[in-house]
Amino acid sequence: MQTRIARSSPCEFDSIDPMHLVMTMPSEREALVRLLRSNPRDPELPQLLAAVESMHPANLGRDLELLRGVWELRWSSSSQPWLRHTPWLDNLQVLDPAQGQGCNLLRFQGPLGSLGSIRVQADLTPIDQQRIGVHFRRGGWVGPKLMALGQPQLLREVQQSLPAWLDITVLDEQLRICRGNAGTVFALLKRPDLNVADFLP
Protein backbone atom coordinates (compact mmCIF):
# COMPACT_ATOMS: atom_id res chain seq x y z
CA MET A 1 0.00 0.00 0.00
CA GLN A 2 1.44 3.31 -1.04
CA THR A 3 1.19 6.38 1.12
CA ARG A 4 0.21 9.44 -0.83
CA ILE A 5 1.61 12.72 0.37
CA ALA A 6 -0.77 15.58 -0.18
CA ARG A 7 0.87 18.53 -1.81
CA SER A 8 -0.44 22.03 -1.74
CA SER A 9 -1.22 23.50 -5.06
CA PRO A 10 1.39 26.05 -6.15
CA CYS A 11 -1.34 28.59 -6.61
CA GLU A 12 -2.02 28.58 -2.84
CA PHE A 13 1.42 30.13 -2.25
CA ASP A 14 1.78 32.07 -5.47
CA SER A 15 -1.23 34.17 -4.48
CA ILE A 16 0.50 35.39 -1.28
CA ASP A 17 2.34 38.68 -1.66
CA PRO A 18 5.45 38.71 0.60
CA MET A 19 5.30 42.51 0.79
CA HIS A 20 1.74 42.26 2.08
CA LEU A 21 2.96 40.03 4.91
CA VAL A 22 5.66 42.54 5.82
CA MET A 23 3.26 45.48 5.72
CA THR A 24 0.66 43.74 7.90
CA MET A 25 3.13 42.65 10.57
CA PRO A 26 3.02 45.06 13.53
CA SER A 27 6.12 47.24 13.78
CA GLU A 28 8.18 47.45 16.95
CA ARG A 29 6.73 50.89 17.59
CA GLU A 30 3.13 49.66 17.25
CA ALA A 31 3.88 46.67 19.47
CA LEU A 32 5.44 48.98 22.06
CA VAL A 33 2.45 51.34 22.13
CA ARG A 34 0.08 48.40 22.42
CA LEU A 35 2.00 46.90 25.35
CA LEU A 36 2.33 50.24 27.13
CA ARG A 37 -1.45 50.57 26.99
CA SER A 38 -2.43 47.02 27.85
CA ASN A 39 0.40 45.54 29.93
CA PRO A 40 3.03 48.05 31.12
CA ARG A 41 4.71 45.35 33.22
CA ASP A 42 5.47 43.10 30.25
CA PRO A 43 9.10 41.86 30.42
CA GLU A 44 9.54 42.48 26.68
CA LEU A 45 9.20 46.24 27.10
CA PRO A 46 12.91 47.10 27.68
CA GLN A 47 13.92 45.26 24.50
CA LEU A 48 11.18 46.96 22.48
CA LEU A 49 12.12 50.35 23.90
CA ALA A 50 15.73 49.92 22.83
CA ALA A 51 14.68 48.82 19.34
CA VAL A 52 12.35 51.79 18.85
CA GLU A 53 15.00 54.21 20.15
CA SER A 54 17.48 52.96 17.55
CA MET A 55 14.99 53.14 14.66
CA HIS A 56 13.11 56.37 15.46
CA PRO A 57 15.53 58.92 16.98
CA ALA A 58 13.94 62.20 18.05
CA ASN A 59 14.87 65.54 16.52
CA LEU A 60 13.67 68.48 18.62
CA GLY A 61 14.94 70.93 16.04
CA ARG A 62 12.21 69.58 13.78
CA ASP A 63 9.57 68.22 16.18
CA LEU A 64 9.69 70.40 19.31
CA GLU A 65 5.99 71.25 19.03
CA LEU A 66 5.12 67.54 19.41
CA LEU A 67 6.32 67.79 23.02
CA ARG A 68 3.38 69.99 23.93
CA GLY A 69 0.66 68.06 25.70
CA VAL A 70 -0.25 65.97 28.72
CA TRP A 71 1.77 62.75 28.85
CA GLU A 72 1.04 59.71 31.02
CA LEU A 73 3.92 57.67 32.40
CA ARG A 74 3.40 54.02 31.43
CA TRP A 75 6.82 52.49 32.12
CA SER A 76 10.02 53.45 33.89
CA SER A 77 13.32 51.77 34.74
CA SER A 78 13.28 53.49 38.14
CA SER A 79 12.67 51.61 41.40
CA GLN A 80 11.13 54.71 43.01
CA PRO A 81 7.34 54.25 43.34
CA TRP A 82 6.55 57.84 42.29
CA LEU A 83 8.56 57.34 39.09
CA ARG A 84 6.75 54.15 38.05
CA HIS A 85 3.35 53.34 36.58
CA THR A 86 0.76 52.57 39.26
CA PRO A 87 -2.76 51.40 38.27
CA TRP A 88 -4.57 53.58 40.82
CA LEU A 89 -2.60 56.79 40.15
CA ASP A 90 -2.40 59.19 37.24
CA ASN A 91 1.31 59.89 36.82
CA LEU A 92 1.34 62.77 34.37
CA GLN A 93 3.85 65.14 32.83
CA VAL A 94 2.52 68.36 31.34
CA LEU A 95 4.78 70.14 28.84
CA ASP A 96 4.50 73.45 27.02
CA PRO A 97 7.95 74.08 25.50
CA ALA A 98 6.83 77.18 23.59
CA GLN A 99 6.09 78.85 26.94
CA GLY A 100 9.06 77.22 28.68
CA GLN A 101 6.81 75.55 31.26
CA GLY A 102 6.12 72.07 32.53
CA CYS A 103 5.05 70.12 35.59
CA ASN A 104 5.05 66.61 37.00
CA LEU A 105 1.72 65.62 38.53
CA LEU A 106 0.43 62.76 40.68
CA ARG A 107 -3.27 62.31 41.46
CA PHE A 108 -5.65 59.52 42.36
CA GLN A 109 -7.74 58.03 39.58
CA GLY A 110 -11.51 58.09 39.85
CA PRO A 111 -13.55 60.22 42.28
CA LEU A 112 -10.60 60.77 44.64
CA GLY A 113 -8.87 62.71 41.87
CA SER A 114 -11.15 65.65 42.68
CA LEU A 115 -9.22 66.13 45.95
CA GLY A 116 -6.34 67.70 44.04
CA SER A 117 -2.87 66.61 43.03
CA ILE A 118 0.80 66.73 43.97
CA ARG A 119 2.70 68.85 41.46
CA VAL A 120 6.24 69.98 40.79
CA GLN A 121 6.47 73.00 38.49
CA ALA A 122 9.48 73.50 36.24
CA ASP A 123 11.03 75.81 33.66
CA LEU A 124 12.03 74.13 30.39
CA THR A 125 14.89 75.14 28.09
CA PRO A 126 15.71 73.35 24.82
CA ILE A 127 19.47 72.68 24.70
CA ASP A 128 20.04 70.66 21.53
CA GLN A 129 18.25 68.25 19.18
CA GLN A 130 17.40 65.84 22.00
CA ARG A 131 18.05 67.54 25.34
CA ILE A 132 15.68 69.70 27.39
CA GLY A 133 17.04 71.50 30.43
CA VAL A 134 14.77 71.31 33.49
CA HIS A 135 14.83 73.75 36.41
CA PHE A 136 12.36 72.80 39.14
CA ARG A 137 10.76 75.82 40.82
CA ARG A 138 7.95 74.92 43.21
CA GLY A 139 6.23 71.79 44.43
CA GLY A 140 3.38 70.74 46.68
CA TRP A 141 -0.38 70.25 46.74
CA VAL A 142 -2.76 71.91 44.27
CA GLY A 143 -6.42 71.60 45.15
CA PRO A 144 -9.54 71.52 42.98
CA LYS A 145 -10.86 74.65 41.31
CA LEU A 146 -13.55 76.20 43.49
CA MET A 147 -15.85 78.87 42.10
CA ALA A 148 -15.69 81.12 45.17
CA LEU A 149 -12.13 80.45 46.34
CA GLY A 150 -10.25 79.86 43.11
CA GLN A 151 -7.74 77.02 43.30
CA PRO A 152 -6.09 76.54 46.70
CA GLN A 153 -2.38 75.70 46.65
CA LEU A 154 0.24 74.71 49.18
CA LEU A 155 3.54 75.09 47.35
CA ARG A 156 7.11 75.72 48.39
CA GLU A 157 10.28 76.54 46.51
CA VAL A 158 12.34 73.57 45.30
CA GLN A 159 16.04 73.72 46.16
CA GLN A 160 17.70 72.23 43.08
CA SER A 161 21.42 71.91 43.71
CA LEU A 162 22.42 70.22 40.42
CA PRO A 163 21.36 70.74 36.80
CA ALA A 164 18.62 68.43 35.52
CA TRP A 165 17.63 67.49 32.00
CA LEU A 166 15.66 65.09 29.85
CA ASP A 167 17.08 63.50 26.72
CA ILE A 168 14.12 62.93 24.38
CA THR A 169 15.10 59.84 22.38
CA VAL A 170 11.76 59.09 20.64
CA LEU A 171 8.95 61.56 19.97
CA ASP A 172 5.79 61.43 17.86
CA GLU A 173 2.09 62.24 18.20
CA GLN A 174 1.47 59.34 20.60
CA LEU A 175 4.73 58.12 22.09
CA ARG A 176 7.64 59.67 23.96
CA ILE A 177 10.72 57.89 25.29
CA CYS A 178 13.20 59.90 27.33
CA ARG A 179 16.16 59.48 29.65
CA GLY A 180 16.74 61.59 32.74
CA ASN A 181 20.08 62.94 33.92
CA ALA A 182 20.28 60.04 36.41
CA GLY A 183 19.99 57.53 33.54
CA THR A 184 16.37 56.54 34.21
CA VAL A 185 14.38 55.57 31.11
CA PHE A 186 10.75 56.70 30.83
CA ALA A 187 8.08 55.71 28.30
CA LEU A 188 4.99 57.90 28.10
CA LEU A 189 1.83 58.06 26.00
CA LYS A 190 0.05 61.29 25.15
CA ARG A 191 -3.37 61.88 26.73
CA PRO A 192 -5.43 63.75 24.08
CA ASP A 193 -8.37 63.82 26.51
CA LEU A 194 -6.47 66.18 28.85
CA ASN A 195 -5.70 69.85 28.18
CA VAL A 196 -2.41 71.60 28.97
CA ALA A 197 -4.29 74.77 29.95
CA ASP A 198 -5.99 72.92 32.82
CA PHE A 199 -2.63 72.28 34.53
CA LEU A 200 -0.35 75.19 33.62
CA PRO A 201 -0.99 78.90 34.25
Per-segment meaning from a language model:
Residues D17-P201:
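Soluble ligand-binding/transfer domains with enclosed cavities or grooves
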Residues R4-A6:
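Intrinsically disordered, low-complexity polar regions and short flexible loop motifs
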